[in-house]
Amino acid sequence: MKTSMFLTLTGLVLLFVVCYASESEEKEFPKELLSSIFAADSDFKEEERGCFGYKCDYYKGCCSGYVCSPTWKWCVRPGPGRR
């Protein structure tokens, strides 16, 4: 009983934090969280995936065959609806 209440309370707190971060003006928390989840060692990226998942911005572009995602600021494969 105590464990289930603790897990429920922890889940609600986590939900509150994510909702607050997504509604904040800066909206940096979800982006940093996703970037850290999908970030990997640079040797692994070059070996297995090319430059998929590299961080990018206006000045630092991506490898050929990839585009910079305007939302998440990492390199993705071009597809429908992506520039």
UniProtKB/Swiss-Prot annotation:
Subcellular location(s) of the protein: Secreted
**Tissue expr:** Expressed by the venom gland.
Major subcellular site: secreted
What cellular component terms from Gene Ontology apply here? extracellular region
- State the disulfide connectivity: 51-63, 56-68, 62-75
Which range is the signal sequence, renumbered to this chain?
1-21
Q: Which residues form the propeptide?
A: 22-49
Q: By what name is this protein known?
A: U5-theraphotoxin-Hs1b 1
